[in-house]
């Protein structure tokens, strides 16, 4: 039986944020009755906000699903995920601490453009293994609308393709589905919620992020400049990207 949530750990979520997540889950059929959902908790503001949103949905939605949490520990210096475990267990949820020497294996990629993507692929593989081992069939990730927009422009500028991340898709093996319930949410919303609640945010400590400005950061700055001129920017981008985001929604 899944642990129940303690009343004292129920975190209020802003209605707008909750509505946007609920709409995304409905629009893309992200969670089905009886699903066992494993949330990838990095310790950032986005995954911590998503944890609060999904625990609230689990309590109040008519949709019945199980929820667990996994944190990938890349064995990088100063990464201490214990506060995340305390937070998750305080919510009455199972927490899986996945220790893998991703940091060590990635050192030979340091300084190359592929460094971040290499780490991301490694982390994703660890999460897939955890989900399969523990009997989960859905992996929930914390990318938001800003992330989708940045990926869209990076693909267009550097690969000559109109692509972005998918809101909901099956992995190649067919046994897991991956969902991104924050697809309609803005980064500033998750930041305001996580910081306002005093959630145990872990600051990024990857040396590659400090030494080399990423292309994603450049896209973030470009979009911020354009949004300052046109506040409707992300609404328009969402409309433009929706066919791309929905292309692999499972039947």
Indicate residue ranges for each PLM-predicted region.
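ATP-dependent adenylation/nucleotidyltransferase module used to activate substrates
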Residues: 2-152, 158, 188-196, 248
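Generic structural signal for well-ordered, non-membrane alpha-helical segments
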Residues: 14, 120, 212-215, 230, ...
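Catalytic subdomain that performs nucleotidyl-dependent activation
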Residues: 66-67, 146-218, 222-225
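Short, solvent-exposed coil/turn elements at secondary-structure transition points
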Residues: 73-75, 101-103, 171, 184, ...
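Long, contiguous binding/interaction regions
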Residues: 87, 153, 227-231
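An accessory alpha-helical subdomain
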Residues: 218, 222-244
